[in-house]
């Protein structure tokens, strides 16, 4: 749907349209949500998860590091301008509603790093999760971070689509590798997953 919207209306018109839904509550809410896309936050979640499974932790950390390395390379390769620059040049910046106190950047827009980190984290967790409702919540959390980057005028829809795609592909690849890497099980976690009805080392 996002790719279709970009094809039909272009990233500037899509950005201006989505900017029309600002409210004071959402300003505060999306600033909080976007923090879940920070690399430090994601790594802390995975380190905390190691009390349940080292496999989760290693898979997630490898996924995030690989994803963010590729994102950094692409950011500097494309050096794409952010909404601040593009919308100013398009003559529509004066009509844009901004979140007060949230600083804006003007370069290295493509792809979105926060979106990539969030999708890397939540995709990894979803792949290991066994319950459908948990997978759904994790997917919605990743989508929320992606939307927050657009809401806060940090990225275009194309940026978050690229970040989410790269992270998802890398996370799936790392997950498939981690399921077969026996050396990852280098110790017993603090909390046994058997208490929660599933094996600690899935095959």
Language model region names:
Residues 3-5, 9, 66-73, 141-153:
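Aromatic-anchored segments of alpha-helical transmembrane domains
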Residues 28, 53, 57, 61, ...:
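Hydrophobic, aromatic-rich alpha-helical transmembrane segments
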Residues 1-44, 75-104, 202:
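N-terminal transmembrane-helix/juxtamembrane module of multi-pass inner/ER membrane proteins
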Residues 15, 50, 71-79, 126, ...:
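Membrane-water interface at transmembrane helix exits
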Residues 93-203:
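Membrane-embedded catalytic cores of phosphoryl/pyrophosphoryl-handling enzymes
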Residues 25-26, 53-57, 130-136:
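Membrane-helix interface segments
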Residues 3-7, 45-52, 125-128, 147-151:
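Hydrophobic alpha-helical transmembrane segments
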């Amino acid at each position: 749907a996002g790719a279709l919207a970009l094809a039909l209306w272009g990233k500037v018109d899509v950005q201006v349209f989505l900017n029309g839904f600002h409210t004071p509550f959402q300003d505060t809410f999306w600033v909080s949500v976007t923090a879940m896309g920070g690399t430090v936050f994601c790594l802390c979640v995975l380190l905390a998860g190691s009390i349940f499974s080292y496999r989760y932790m290693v898979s997630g950390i490898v996924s995030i590091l690989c994803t963010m390395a590729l994102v950094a390379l692409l950011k500097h390769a494309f050096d794409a301008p952010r909404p601040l620059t593009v919308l100013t040049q398009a003559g529509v910046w004066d009509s844009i509603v901004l979140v007060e106190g949230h600083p804006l950047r003007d370069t290295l827009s493509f792809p979105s790093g926060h979106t990539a980190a969030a999708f890397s984290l939540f995709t990894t967790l979803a792949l290991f999760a066994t319950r459908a409702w948990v997978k759904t919540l994790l997917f919605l959390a990743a989508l929320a971070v992606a939307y927050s980057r657009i809401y806060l005028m940090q990225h275009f829809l194309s940026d978050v689509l690229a970040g989410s795609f790269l992270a998802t592909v890398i996370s799936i690849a790392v997950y498939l590798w981690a399921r077969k890497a026996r050396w990852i099980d280098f110790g017993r976690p603090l909390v046994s997953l058997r208490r929660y009805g599933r094996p600690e080392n899935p095959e």
